[in-house]
């Protein structure tokens, strides 16, 4: 298996960014930035394992459990289990477990959801109201743009696969340390997508024989310490490793007008409705091309690609 180390571009960090400066200088650039020195409330010092266990109590939560650190959405190398929150958070903070589902060194991951996952969004104020009182969310967007606030807890070493979201978001690292690797939306041709996720699971040691184009993807990287906030614009791919047991909060908001999004989307990962319709139309067009012999199909497919490039690609060199 051919492997090559990819150089990384460090995501820039800014200290003490106000709402006004963010909206004027940062947000229009549509690039990731680490925001330091943000006022987040007492959560960064208060959220110990003992406090979390006591504050959220025995509320049952559905969690991911994996016998290996690198979670794989292709082979589904994890299972879903339900635990009382206080039991879960203590297990997630452990390295070796006396009680376990798969193995004594299994990893745990919580991604909070709404009461009815088909209809309700994740909102820390509703699912974990006591904890929500400890958090001051940077409201660098209008209230009507707010979509969800997702509470996350990860075991040390857990790695989530590379994916994109269709909403802008702040990844607020409350406790612990994370490494985040990101890829620009413009590198989508090199990421071997399956839906919203990249099939290149190991971004540190990719199999270039299987995924040769991945070598062309420009890697951006940052490390988040407790109290850091990472701005991830919509459609930027991100891969996250929890280097320590940690607690985080994702705050998603709508960059586009509300009517552009799928109203049935409770996770923030369904493509905008116009994009979904366009992809369906393209699929029908490709089906129509199958009526032609291969030589003609190839010719007209290339013309279609040129038409898309001329009409839909941005014409700058960014």
Swiss-Prot record:
It holds the Pfam family Cupin_8. GO terms for molecular function: iron ion binding; protein homodimerization activity; tRNA binding; tRNA(Phe) (7-(3-amino-3-carboxypropyl)wyosine37-C2)-hydroxylase activity. Residues 126-270 form the JmjC domain. Keywords: Dioxygenase, Iron, Metal-binding, Oxidoreductase, tRNA processing. It catalyses: 7-[(3S)-3-amino-3-carboxypropyl]wyosine(37) in tRNA(Phe) + 2-oxoglutarate + O2 = 7-(2-hydroxy-3-amino-3-carboxypropyl)wyosine(37) in tRNA(Phe) + succinate + CO2. Its cofactor is Fe(2+). It comes from the Eukaryota. Fe cation binds at residues 163, 165, 238. 2-oxoglutarate binds at residues 109, 169, 178. Pathway: tRNA modification; wybutosine-tRNA(Phe) biosynthesis. Binds 1 Fe(2+) ion per subunit. Its EC number is 1.14.11.42. InterPro entries: Cupin_8, JmjC_dom. GO terms for biological process: wybutosine biosynthetic process. Belongs to the TYW5 family. tRNA hydroxylase that acts as a component of the wybutosine biosynthesis pathway. Wybutosine is a hyper modified guanosine with a tricyclic base found at the 3'-position adjacent to the anticodon of eukaryotic phenylalanine tRNA. Catalyzes the hydroxylation of 7-(a-amino-a-carboxypropyl)wyosine (yW-72) into undermodified hydroxywybutosine (OHyW*). OHyW* being further transformed into hydroxywybutosine (OHyW) by LCMT2/TYW4. OHyW is a derivative of wybutosine found in higher eukaryotes. PANTHER family: HYPOXIA-INDUCIBLE FACTOR 1 ALPHA INHIBITOR-RELATED, TRNA WYBUTOSINE-SYNTHESIZING PROTEIN 5. This is tRNA wybutosine-synthesizing protein 5. It comes from Gallus gallus (Chicken).
């Amino acid at each position: 298996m051919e492997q090559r180390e990819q150089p990384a571009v460090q995501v820039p960090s800014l200290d003490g960014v106000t709402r006004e400066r963010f909206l004027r200088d940062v947000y229009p650039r549509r690039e990731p930035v680490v925001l330091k020195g943000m006022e987040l409330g007492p959560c960064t010092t208060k959220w110990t394992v003992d406090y979390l266990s006591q504050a959220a109590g025995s509320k049952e939560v559905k969690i991911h459990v994996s016998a290996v650190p690198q979670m794989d959405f292709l082979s589904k190398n994890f299972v879903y289990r339900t635990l009382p929150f206080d039991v879960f958070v203590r297990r997630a903070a452990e390295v070796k477990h006396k009680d376990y589902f798969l193995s004594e060194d299994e990893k745990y991951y919580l991604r909070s959801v709404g009461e009815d996952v088909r209809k309700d969004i994740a909102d820390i104020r509703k699912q974990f109201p006591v904890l929500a009182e400890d958090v001051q969310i940077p409201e660098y967007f209008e209230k009507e743009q707010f979509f969800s606030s997702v509470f996350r807890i990860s075991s040390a070493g857990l790695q989530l696969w590379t994916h994109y979201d269709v909403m802008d978001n702040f990844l607020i690292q409350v406790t612990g340390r994370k490494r985040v690797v990101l890829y620009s939306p413009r590198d989508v041709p090199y990421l071997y997508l399956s839906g919203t996720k990249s099939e290149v699971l190991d971004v540190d040691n990719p199999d270039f024989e299987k995924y040769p184009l991945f070598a062309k993807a420009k890697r951006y990287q940052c490390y988040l310490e407790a109290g850091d906030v990472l701005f991830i614009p919509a459609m930027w791919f991100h891969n996250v490793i929890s280097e320590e047991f940690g607690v985080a909060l994702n705050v998603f908001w709508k960059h586009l007008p509300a009517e552009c999004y799928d109203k049935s989307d409770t996770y923030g990962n369904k493509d905008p409705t116009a994009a979904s319709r366009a992809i369906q139309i393209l699929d029908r067009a490709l089906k129509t091309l199958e009526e032609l012999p291969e030589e003609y199909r190839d010719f007209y497919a290339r013309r279609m690609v040129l038409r898309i490039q001329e009409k839909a690609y941005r014409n700058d060199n960014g």
